[in-house]
């Protein structure tokens, strides 16, 4: 088992490191730059080319069945699931075969609604302590299931 983190704008890198260290699981932090290296030997920083979806492409090509990917990118999560991996969002939501279709459809609907009203105010929810707690519990659950 290996954990991959789609690291751009990911607020749970330290939490992944804590859980992975406890379970002695290697982690790859994939980004197109700007990530501080960890002194922890299980942590590996992978810098990909700049450009849209470069980190996603790397992760999708690298994972094997049983790996876990931390990402908020739903199309990447769908590819992970197709390849036998597990996907978890940084708020603790586990993306599965059963819910990925609905999540993709909702994402597409929301994209269409936002483009229909370019003046609509973006309402990005702040990452909270309860999100962090949900994430830690869900990651622990995924690891124990694997």
PLM feature segments, named:
Residues 2-146:
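Nuclease catalytic cores that cleave nucleic-acid phosphodiester bonds
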């Amino acid at each position: 088992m290996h954990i991959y983190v789609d690291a751009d704008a990911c607020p749970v890198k330290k939490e992944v490191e804590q859980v992975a260290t406890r379970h002695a699981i290697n982690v790859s932090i994939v980004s197109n730059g700007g990530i501080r290296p960890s002194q922890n030997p299980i942590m590996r920083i992978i810098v990909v080319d700049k450009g849209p979806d470069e980190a996603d492409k790397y992760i999708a090509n690298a994972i094997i069945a049983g790996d876990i990917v931390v990402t908020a990118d739903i199309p990447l999560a769908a590819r992970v699931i197709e390849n036998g991996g597990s996907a978890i969002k940084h708020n603790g939501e586990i993306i599965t075969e059963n819910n990925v279709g609905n999540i993709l459809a909702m994402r597409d609907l929301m994209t269409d609604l936002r483009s229909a009203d370019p003046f609509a105010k973006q309402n990005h929810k702040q990452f909270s302590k309860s999100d962090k707690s949900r994430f830690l519990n869900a990651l622990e659950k995924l690891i124990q299931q694997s």
